[in-house]
Amino acid sequence: MVTLPTSLLISDCYMLFNLAILFGTLVAMEGVGTLAHKYIMHGWGWWLHRSHHEPHLGMLETNDVYLVALALVAAGLVALGKAGYAPLQWVGAGVAGYGVLYVLAHDGLFHRHWPCAPKPVNRYLKRLYRAHRLHHAMPGRKGSVSFGFFYAPPLRVLKRQVQARKHR
């Protein structure tokens, strides 16, 4: 039987702990993103987010300020982690990872801002795409549905919500 040095085992456990923080943050960011989208972007921060719901020319919109803020939070957490609060750098990496996935999927797949815009190919991506289209179906900031990014309720539920909100 081969025995491993204790330092190697501790190092492996430390890396597993860090990876758990990273992936846990990625998952938690869906909840944070959903709440921020619903209550900040469609609430008091609508003045910045409105550009995302209206036709515009060019690649940039005032809504991109939210992505810059997310990047600053991620960078700040990584910096704090490097300054001695080690787990925070992995939280920052998870926040940054969520931001990268957001840009790739949201801007590339949902809004097709990339030169070679891919189309959703599987049931999961098609559901997210359709939910996002329903989110944009309601004019203005009130009455929207599906504020999440990586999770969308079943389409039949969202369609019922849209119909109910149109008749208010």
Task: Briefly describe each language-model feature range.
Residues 2-16, 28, 43-44, 48-66, ...:
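Cytosolic/stromal cytosol-facing helical appendages immediately following the last transmembrane segment
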Residues 17-36:
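N-terminal signal-anchor transmembrane alpha helix
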Residues 20-24, 90-95:
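Small-residue packing motifs within transmembrane alpha-helices
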Residues 32-46:
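Short, charged cytosolic
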Residues 35-36, 95, 119:
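A general structural-boundary detector
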Residues 67-71, 92:
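Alpha-helical transmembrane segments and their immediate juxtamembrane boundary regions
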Residues 71-78:
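Hydrophobic, membrane-inserted alpha-helices
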